[in-house]
Amino acid sequence: MRTFAYRDAATADGFAVGELLDDATVRDPIDGRPRPIAELTPAPALARTGKVICIGLNYRDHCDEQGVPYPDRPMLFAKFGNALIADGEPIVRPEGCQALDFEVELGVVIGRRATRVTVADAMAHVSGYVVVNDVSARDWQGAKPALAPGERGDGQWLRAKGSDTFLPMGPVFVSAGEIPDPGALRLRSWRIPGSGPDAGRAIPMQDGSAANMVFDIPALIAFVSNAITLEPGDLISTGTPAGVGVFRDPPVFLEPGDVARCEIGGIGQVENRVMDAGTQVP
């Protein structure tokens, strides 16, 4: 099943999820009538997430573009509910951040409690998939290309990756049965400048395959659940392919007015404009 999440003032929590009838129409979960998606305000596919476990350095080409070896075990970090925003909502560049970057990622949604599961059993705990954007303050993270000579950054990934609005999520959830081979999914991203000679033009950034993961989804679930029990509604954001802004020459970062677009074939996309803290971008 493929579902679409949207804002609905008629519900108790202001949130509704309907079955996608086609790319332009969703079935109203209350009365069953078809509703045009163009008339709806998207919400995150998961209205509320539990734990958000993110994986660093999990695509071979992403390691290659940094000149670092492939990790021998998954690299974990986390985001929280404060970071979650919907398609069309603004990414807020925090005060003091000058190197805002983004990454398209496949989000794996947990459907059954998982504690110390094996690789062989791991996929039985997956309910489905979403597209997410891992937004990063690269200067806070301490990524060398984002720093001026002599600067160090604070190296605090929790702050650099977990700031408010740093987890845009698309409105579409696709159940696991609809995607028998998630390793075949194509991940792409674009930056759309808000000003300058390329204003309004979608500039390709990333174009990769989930087959290029260092650790596949079963391996990630087994590794995480060995130490951290995964509950229904938890999310594993599985890493990103090459092409991110910080490792380009010269580096490319998001500026206020720019739009970040992330897309996964067979799932959908999430698109968000950047604004500075305290500044509304039209």
Regions found by a protein language model. Give the residues of each.
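Hydrophobic alpha-helical segments and helix pairs
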Residues: 76-129
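Hydrophobic beta-sheet segments that form the core/acyl-binding groove
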Residues: 1-8, 89-96, 104-106, 110-114, ...
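A short secondary-structure junction signal
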Residues: 64-66, 88-90, 117-122, 140-144, ...
